[in-house]
UniProtKB/Swiss-Prot annotation:
Function: Type II interferon produced by immune cells such as T-cells and NK cells that plays crucial roles in antimicrobial, antiviral, and antitumor responses by activating effector immune cells and enhancing antigen presentation. Primarily signals through the JAK-STAT pathway after interaction with its receptor IFNGR1 to affect gene regulation. Upon IFNG binding, IFNGR1 intracellular domain opens out to allow association of downstream signaling components JAK2, JAK1 and STAT1, leading to STAT1 activation, nuclear translocation and transcription of IFNG-regulated genes.
Family: Belongs to the type II (or gamma) interferon family.
Gene Ontology biological-process annotations: adaptive immune response; defense response to virus; humoral immune response
Any GO MF annotation of the entry: type II interferon receptor binding
Protein name per its UniProtKB record: Interferon gamma
Residues where Pyrrolidone carboxylic acid is found: 24
Main location: secreted
Tissues of expression: Released primarily from activated T lymphocytes.
Subunit structure: Homodimer. Interacts with IFNGR1 (via extracellular domain); this interaction promotes IFNGR1 dimerization.
Entry-listed glycosylation sites: 39, 106
Origin species: Peromyscus maniculatus
Length: 175
């Protein structure tokens, strides 16, 4: 289990580095601290392949990269929450969480708090389930593409209905 946790922390840094974030020296030092703590240099760490990077790469081709990134970040916050009582790595985890605040949440603690709030909603609570189903239509509406909701406006001049001549249409030119 310890090796898995270390690999997860390393993957977090790699995910952020690949997505264009600049890893400062202190962040790298903290990740090195986690690697030492979890003995991630052991040969069995790589068994079974990568944990999330293969999945993340598959989403690089789509424009919906933020969706998978938010799931990966959610995963790491759950991991960090599970490790919060470990005094030996508490400072390292705090540094990494601060870096996430800057790079993923655009330095907005309010966005991070909202993210954490949604992440911690208990899905097995019947009252939560009722509220979630009640709000589902509104959520689906907000997720729908905005472009399909708008009607295109057509310029009257292009179809002969306007008073202005259209320089691209020979029929609209006056003699």
């Amino acid at each position: 289990m310890n090796a898995t946790c270390c690999i997860l922390a390393l993957l977090l840094c790699l995910t952020q580095a690949i997505s264009g974030c600049y890893c400062q020296g202190t962040l790298i030092e903290e990740i090195e601290n986690l690697k030492k703590h979890f003995n991630s240099s052991s040969s069995d760490v790589g068994d079974g392949g990568e944990l999330v990077l293969d999945i993340w790469r598959n989403w690089q081709k789509d424009g919906d990269i933020k969706i998978i990134e938010s799931q990966i970040i959610s995963f790491y916050f759950k991991l960090f929450d599970a490790l919060k009582d470990n005094q030996a790595i508490q400072e390292s985890i705090g540094t990494i969480e601060q870096d996430l605040l800057v790079h993923f949440f655009n330095s907005s603690e309010e966005k991070r708090d909202d993210f954490m709030k949604v992440m911690k909603i208990p899905v097995d609570d019947p009252q939560v389930q009722r509220k979630a189903v009640n709000e589902l239509l509104g959520v689906m509406y907000r997720l729908s593409p905005k472009n399909s909701l708008r009607k295109r406006k057509r310029s009257r001049c292009c179809f002969g209905g306007g008073a202005r001549p259209n320089k691209n249409n020979a029929a609209s030119k006056t003699i």
